[in-house]
């Protein structure tokens, strides 16, 4: 919704409103920049839970300026987390309502077959799994059946935590990430203090008119 030179933005899954959503922000900015306001180089958004966000053109990509949410060590993860994932992680981190299970190898992340019934019973809303990548700096997957989807194809919001975590682990501020869902996706991340720049692309697949 436009408000002055900005747009108000909120995100909803089939079940609830969420605090931050990367792909919906990317898609909103893409539509504004290419259809509603063609030629515009940046779009500022005001959001209910995540404050001001800005999306800018960066060559062929769109760069989203999001808050960094560094994870902390979860000292007492629920036993059902390990049971839900089917393989013990090397470490468990936490950010707000998400757990982050850290594995040692990319193939561990690829091979996880979660029990979504158990994942949904966990108090936090979602579970991300991650590991160092083979042809990227790190990889991840994200499960959130309590939000209304078993596995998210690409999750910008979790990379607000994954990027600071792997930046510290790898001694890098610019990282290339892959999400290993069935559809798959890749992001380019830059950690800048308390902000994370997430870069990706968008493709127009359908256009039409709705008469009200």
Indicate where each model-derived feature is located:
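Active-site proximal loop and beta-alpha junction motif in alpha/beta enzyme cores
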Residues: 1-20, 24-212
């Amino acid at each position: 919704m436009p408000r002055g030179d900005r747009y108000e933005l909120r995100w909803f899954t089939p079940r609830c409103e969420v605090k931050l959503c990367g792909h919906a922000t990317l898609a909103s900015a893409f539509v504004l920049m290419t259809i509603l306001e063609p030629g515009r180089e940046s779009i500022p958004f005001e959001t209910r839970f995540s404050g001001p966000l800005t999306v800018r053109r960066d060559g062929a990509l769109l760069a989203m300026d999001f808050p960094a949410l560094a994870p902390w060590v979860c000292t007492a993860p629920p036993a059902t987390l390990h049971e839900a994932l089917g393989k013990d992680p090397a470490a468990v981190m936490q950010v707000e309502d998400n757990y982050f299970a850290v594995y040692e190898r990319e193939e561990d992340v690829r091979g996880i077959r979660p029990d979504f019934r158990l994942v949904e019973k966990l108090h936090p809303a979602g579970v991300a799994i991650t590991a160092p990548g083979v042809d990227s700096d790190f990889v991840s997957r994200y499960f959130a059946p309590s939000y209304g989807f078993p596995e998210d194809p690409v999750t910008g919001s979790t990379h607000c935590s994954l990027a600071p975590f792997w930046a510290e682990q790898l001694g890098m501020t610019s990282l290339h990430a892959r999400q290993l869902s069935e559809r798959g996706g890749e992001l380019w991340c830059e950690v800048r203090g308390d902000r994370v720049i997430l870069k990706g692309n968008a493709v127009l697949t359908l256009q039409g008119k709705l008469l009200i």
